[in-house]
Amino acid sequence: MGSHVAQKQHVVCVPYPAQGHINPMMKVAKLLYAKGFHITFVNTVYNHNRLLRSRGPNAVDGLPSFRFESIPDGLPETDVDVTQDIPTLCESTMKHCLAPFKELLRQINARDDVPPVSCIVSDGCMSFTLDAAEELGVPEVLFWTTSACGFLAYLYYYRFIEKGLSPIKDESYLTKEHLDTKIDWIPSMKNLRLKDIPSFIRTTNPDDIMLNFIIREADRAKRASAIILNTFDDLEHDVIQSMKSIVPPVYSIGPLHLLEKQESGEYSEIGRTGSNLWREETECLDWLNTKARNSVVYVNFGSITVLSAKQLVEFAWGLAATGKEFLWVIRPDLVAGDEAMVPPEFLTATADRRMLASWCPQEKVLSHPAIGGFLTHCGWNSTLESLCGGVPMVCWPFFAEQQTNCKFSRDEWEVGIEIGGDVKREEVEAVVRELMDEEKGKNMREKAEEWRRLANEATEHKHGSSKLNFEMLVNKVLLGE
C-alpha cells in the first residue's frame, strides 16, 4: 500500500435514500473532503441509477479521493423516477442493508489504492451502520438531518407510548380537541401540543412501521460516537442543551450549505459534484432576475409530500387570487396516484405572472432578492434555507417533524404563518396576502433577516459556533486527537 494512500483518513458516508437526506449528507462529505479526508459516498443502487439519469453518465465518477459506491435497498428493482414509499423503505433498509454494507466495507479495506476505513458518518435513520462500525472498531457519527427540536421530540417518542398518548385508540382522536392536548414534559420545548409532535405518533396501529422505526433509531443514537445536526446554536440553543444529557456529544454544524460554501466553494471541482435526483431547471433563476425585490412567492412542497388533486387545485386558485407573481415547483409525482395537473383555466389566468418548474436549485432561489415569501411543507432543509435567505414562510406541514418545525417557525422564530391542513383557496389567498403585503409579513421578514445574519455569523466568522463545532468534530471524533 502506498504511503500517500495510507496517510489519509477514510470516511464512509451513508445517507438515508431520500432527496432531503442525500443533499445534506453530500455537504458533510464535501466539508470532510475539503479537510483532507478520503470519502466514499454510499447511495442505494436505485438512487445511484437515478443520479446517472438526472445528472448524466459522469455523475458518479467522483474524484481520486471522493468515490461513489452503492448497496441494494432490499426492494424490488425499478427504474421509475419516483420518491419511494417511506415506511416500506425504512423497513427494508433496517432489515436488508447491513449485510451488503459490511461486504462493501470488506471490499474497500481489501483494496490497496484507497486508505482503510477509519470512520463512518451515517444518517440517523440508517443506524444498521452502527453494527458494522462496532465490528470494525471505528468511530461512527450519526447525522440526524432533522431540526434539533424535531430530533428531541423523537428522543421522547417512547414516553408517548408510556403515557398512553400513542397509538391512539381510533381516528376519532384526531379531533382538534385531542390534538390540542398539552405536552409539558419535553425539556426546553415550551407551549407544545400533541399536534406539534412529529406526526408518526398519530397512528392507531401499535405495530405501525414508522412509530416503531423512529423509537428504535432514536434509542440506537445513544450508541454513536457523536451526533451531528444541521442547525446552529443561536437558533436552537436550549433544545440542543437538553438533548446533550440523553445522547453522545452533539455538534451543531449548520446551516451546512453556508458552511460548505465557505470551506469548499461551489465552483471548485468537488463543489460541482451534485446529488439531485431530479434534473434542476435553472431557467427559473433567469426568470427571477427580471422581477422586483420581494415580489415573488416561491411554492415548493419538497421531495416527499403528496397532495390530493383537490388540494393542488385549491392551492392553484388561491395563488391566482393573490394577484402576486409566483414560482411553483410541481414534481411529476406531487399528486398521489396521478399526474400532477393544474387546471388549464388557471394556466391561462396566471400566464403573465408565474413560472412552473418540476425541480429547481432551491438554495439559490431562496437567496434570490426577488423572493418575498415561501409557501412550504416545513421540511428542515427548506425551513433552514428560507431562514438563511431572510424569507418568511407560509407553513403547510405534511408529516414527520414538519409539524414541529412549523410550530417553532411560527412561535419561537417568528417567521411563519400556519395554514390549515384542509386547504381552502380563500385561506391560501388570505395568508399569502398577509405575508406579502401586511404588517405581520413585514415583521416576519425583519425577523427572518435577523436569523439570516446569525446563520452567516455561525458559519463565516472564525469564532462562529458552527465553524468551531465542525473543527471539534473533526479533531476530537474523526481524528481522535
UniProtKB/Swiss-Prot annotation:
Pfam families: UDPGT. Keywords: Glycosyltransferase, Transferase. The keyword Transferase applies. GO terms for molecular function: glucuronosyltransferase activity; UDP-glucosyltransferase activity. Its EC number is 2.4.1.-. Belongs to the UDP-glycosyltransferase family. This is UDP-glycosyltransferase 85A2. It comes from Arabidopsis thaliana (Mouse-ear cress).
